[in-house]
Amino acid sequence: MSNLDSLVLEPIEQPLSNTPNMLSNEDRVLCNMTPLQRLYSIDEDTYEELVCVWAYSCLGNKGYTEVYRVGQAGDKGRDVLAYYDRVKGAFDLYQCKQYKSALTYSDLCGEMGKLLIYTFNNTYPIPQNYYILCPKDVSQSFVDLLSNNGKNLKIKLKNYWETVINKKVGPNWVALNEEL
């Protein structure tokens, strides 16, 4: 049994035009909100649902065969899984962050730690792509960490592994070593 089999997964079906959480163009005009304001106003669960629908309906050209929303307590850093081939374990991982301000390194270091630990322990395979979706953008200091092909981010992750990241990951922490 794979680790994915132990999760309760509901496949995302093709969205209907009369989905209750979607506003018609007329409703959008009447409520006087721009699309971005509407995106900012939804809660984190609705945001994850939106990403699932988006992955299903808009990214079909990427070759996804199945899309699942996992986001819940104990999701091991997996909010949305979009599979190219579930049998082979080929998938993209979408990490959704709906915060009131720009995403910072502190907001995300625990999630990156989970990705490293759970892929290292073969709890789930390394995703083809790891996407971080956050409507409020990312902080400039986080953008700076991503420069240099992520070398600055790797250095910070190494420096904060024992003192910060393992605490955020919880009981599944591992010591940082050359293999990891």
Spans of features found by a protein language model:
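Mixed-charge (Asp/Glu-Lys/Arg
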Residues: 1-76, 81-180
